[in-house]
């Protein structure tokens, strides 16, 4: 296999969790895309804290790759801004509220024939709780509280509630 990367390390530099350990070596146990799309488990706390507001996937490594940017015939801009505008925050709150308040059937109907099906309703609810904790979205405290009795989400919901109170 040809090595097109040369000395480029843009993907390694941008990865929020340092999942790329060295050129072409990925530790999936640290990868946001793995945890938000593929995994059916709750990510470890140290990974969750680095997930920020990533609800589904990440792909920063793919976006900064010069070889991928050639496909777009222009340089893709990556924002260094890590805080949400007020309107972005409100939109995020509404989306997360929908995910947590909706039944699995309602979510499936909404995400049908989209890549979000890969995570499914259970994964999206898990991811929503993580985003709420990371972004300190106290406006959704009631929705988090409602998940405490859920067999899968309950332990995570309890941790998120503690985070929201601190």
What kind of feature is each model-predicted range?
Residues 125-135, 155-164:
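Structural detector for internal amphipathic alpha-helices that build alpha-solenoid repeat scaffolds
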Residues 86-119:
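Flexible internal linker/loop segments at domain or repeat junctions
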Residues 106-110, 136-148, 166:
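Amphipathic alpha-helical scaffolding segments comprising HEAT/armadillo-like alpha-solenoid repeats
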Residues 10-33, 54-80:
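Iron-sulfur cluster-binding cysteine motifs and their immediate structural context
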Residues 33-57:
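Acidic/histidine-rich catalytic neighborhood
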Residues 1-13:
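Glycine-rich adenosyl-nucleotide cofactor-binding module
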Residues 105, 118-123, 150-155:
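Alpha-helix N-cap/helix-start positions at coil->helix boundaries
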Residues 49, 67-96, 123, 127, ...:
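A detector for short metal-coordination/catalytic motifs
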């Amino acid at each position: 296999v040809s090595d097109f990367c040369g000395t480029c390390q843009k993907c390694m530099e941008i990865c929020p969790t340092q999942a790329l350990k060295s050129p072409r070596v990925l530790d999936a146990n640290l990868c946001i895309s793995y945890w938000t799309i593929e995994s059916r488990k709750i990510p470890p706390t140290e990974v969750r804290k680095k997930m920020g507001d990533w609800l589904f996937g990440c792909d920063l490594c793919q976006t900064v790759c010069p070889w991928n940017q050639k496909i777009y015939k222009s340089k893709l801009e990556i924002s260094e801004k890590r805080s949400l505008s007020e309107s972005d925050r409100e939109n995020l709150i509404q989306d997360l509220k929908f995910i947590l308040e909706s039944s699995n059937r309602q979510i499936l109907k909404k995400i049908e024939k989209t890549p979000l099906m890969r995570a499914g309703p259970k994964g999206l609810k898990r991811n929503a709780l993580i985003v709420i904790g990371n972004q300190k979205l106290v406006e959704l405290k009631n929705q988090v509280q409602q998940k405490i009795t859920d067999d899968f989400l309950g332990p995570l919901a309890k941790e998120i509630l503690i985070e929201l109170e601190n």
